[in-house]
């Protein structure tokens, strides 16, 4: 092909040689006077050729080198080229403007010859898919590089004998402009599937923005060509498309005469291998929708989206964009498109095009789209959401066209539902089965023709759908049989829906409700119920059809039949995202799931959704049908299919890897976590996971109900006007766990209908591997552990490798989990604590956190809450808290936050409580004393326990005194012992210090202990200490720590000890005063010495000379000694002070030059101004005095 263009203002004929499929026709218009620029497919620089009829070089069908930047074949000088497409001589512009491009009656800009028929009818369907998206988006995800470097369409009118294929080999294999020449911006909320570009080195998340181009390079050419493509005319026939103001009138007279495809041409297309493509049930109109409004490619021509509402029908969902790009560079194998059925999608009332499905098609679903429901545009980001208003707050998420094309537009064929926008209720979590061979992320569109799609789109999951997991993950024989059996008699009976396992979420202030309570609490009409059973119906029909599929937990945020996302913002946090069940082996689904789905189908089909309301108030009312024994379905490539999950088809009640909550797989139960009358959790999902030795404490994946869905009659977490019912009541019956001989799902006789079926909190940060067998609480290794409240904190990090939600697990992703109210959140905290931390319980009381005292005590905010409450708590409330923390008191003592709770009990608790805690400390005094937080508990205990217990506690440190004294934590305990305990009981400490006084006095921690001994011990105990101090006074006064001990003796010691120290200082005042540490000692000597000793020290300074100057002058200039001089001025006798002043006067002028001398002058001025003494020249304030 060739296109006349201007290359650097010179007319040339641009020819491409990148495709080996192109045929060179002699009738191609070529100006012999124009040089030919020949580009090769391998990236060579453009070379001028002398003649236009020269044969095209056979370019290789090469893909770009991964390490190269941009696309192979891009020239560095291409950014300097201006292109001008020349029209045919007989052609006139239809509308003018950048996006006008109308048609001439005699000319078609769409190629009419077979010279671009590139495939020769031999290319496989997957290659056509690639080529189609290449034509649409230049191999760049969502128009990443929608800048043309090659010709798009022939401008001539060639022979019309061949079929009108639209696929070239790789149109933009050699893009003239790469990503580096133009800035690319990322629109807000635009997300795509990773790896969606042909070229591995392209910016995956880049989307070409109308404003992102700086020079408008090549944009007009693209817009000119695309706006005149048949897609433009085709869109106009359907009542929508680009509505440029300057082209509307010009197109009015041409609409009826312009047909994009003739009937015979369309037939040729179908005969030649269905070159048109269909993706996800959506028509792709010639690969490009040139709606300029949606994505204007000219800088400054970014039109507003005011016309979008006009382009859409009143009931249309504008979320459907163009076909999604395939995600690999090479062609996909044909096996990826197996198990698919072709569909017929009417593009127009007069045109029918058969299209092959892509790999994410919905099998067997005919989705007709009338002329008003065709795609709106390629880059229509603004019209891809529909706002629905509910009484509750709704979070409406904007999704891109690439994400939303997995929904089916089945709303046109669902007039019997008539779902109003205000009638939607978010679906609870259900397990759905996707149809075989289709997108494993969908929740099964088998019921799309009845209720609309119950779809979980791909953006919730990050796993690759192709061949990663076994294709047959359900044992659906039993479920399908039960569904077929019960479908007939549930069609018209409203009572059949009494046990419907569908939990409708109510208002923002309520927990999930059963249909009965939902009807009581708010108005429930058939529309609400129909929306609620939407996903269940899809699941039921999928099982009834016997189609194996991927198990998917549909989220509380759901997609209605129009594809819009509806989220109940009033739901409790942590409940909004889906959980995908992807097990390495088959997962068992109970029959009640299928029965619930069939019941939902019957309720919706007959409009009897109001009959969903049951007559009882229990949390769940499962369908009363017998549970057949599901059998594992064999799969050839599944290595685990040969080993049954039942362990010889029998659940051993004593085995740690057996059923989760039951003894037998088919043991009758009153109700079992909402699964069915005889289908306990162990018989459904638990037994399947039992083979791993794991427990599913948080993951009952029932068909239509959540395990933690509570009724209005349940007292758990139900806030009344006065208080909150203790959380541990339903779990532990006080403080002990009920060891029922039956499964947990079977309520005990003492448990009312409102008793929670939720197991106790699991014991790891992500739901540990603890199994609940026979009511006992065990971890994954089979060791029975404490079931007391708060025990989960002790084993929070003890989850085994086989934990269901552990990071090494392959069944669940911990980041996608949703927990019950009492379960451990991803942060490791219970929901009660999480809610308290989020200020949802501003008036929480101590009695309301019963069962969670340990957990609260180990939390920063919870511990502070308990501390504040304990100060003013009643004795009964203190005892309530004490009973829970006593057994794990040591654990709290060494906890960063829990230790404060223990301290509060030593401070405010009763004597019995203090003694009980002191008993817990016995035997652990040394370890606690050396621990950062335990040492604080020991210190508090020493302050408040009786002397007998004090003596017992202190005696445990005997033999470890020096170790504690030199420890950063233990030294505080020793100091507290010296302060609080009777000195007679501390003789072992004095004995331990013998010969170690100097070493300890120069120790950062030991010096503190020495000072405490000097303060509190008996004189005969301190004498040996002081003797050692006097022997090392000269060294200690100059030590960074020892000087504090000497100062302490000078301040608090006996006069004779002070005199000994002063005697050591005399004669060395000048030297020691200039020492950083000794200067402090000299100050204390001047301050605390007797009058005689003080006078001697001051006189030494005044009479002593330091070289040519006096010692006083030297000291006044020194950074340390000047403080000694100031202290001397303060404490000297009046006569001696006058002598000092006269000694200082000759040096006043010089002192003004020194920083520390100014301190002396300030002291003098302050002193004499206070006393009114005239110092002559001193009275004039020197400059810089501070």
From Swiss-Prot:
Tissue: Expressed in brain, heart, kidney, muscle, intestine and stomach. Not expressed in cerebellum, corpus callosum, caudate nucleus, hippocampus, medulla oblongata and putamen. Expressed in all fetal tissues tested.
Location of region: Guanine-nucleotide binding in RNA target: 1079-1083
Region ranges (Uracil-nucleotide binding in RNA target): 899-903, 1043-1047, 1122-1126
Residues recorded as bearing Phosphoserine in the entry: 19, 75, 98, 106, 124, 159, 197, 209, 229, 305, 709, 714, 806, 822
Effect of residue 1047 to E: Changes the specificity for RNA
Role summary: Sequence-specific RNA-binding protein that acts as a post-transcriptional repressor by binding the 3'-UTR of mRNA targets. Binds to an RNA consensus sequence, the Pumilio Response Element (PRE), 5'-UGUANAUA-3', that is related to the Nanos Response Element (NRE). Mediates post-transcriptional repression of transcripts via different mechanisms: acts via direct recruitment of the CCR4-POP2-NOT deadenylase leading to translational inhibition and mRNA degradation. Also mediates deadenylation-independent repression by promoting accessibility of miRNAs.
Protein name per its UniProtKB record: Pumilio homolog 1
Organism of provenance: Homo sapiens (Human)
Gene behind this protein: PUM1
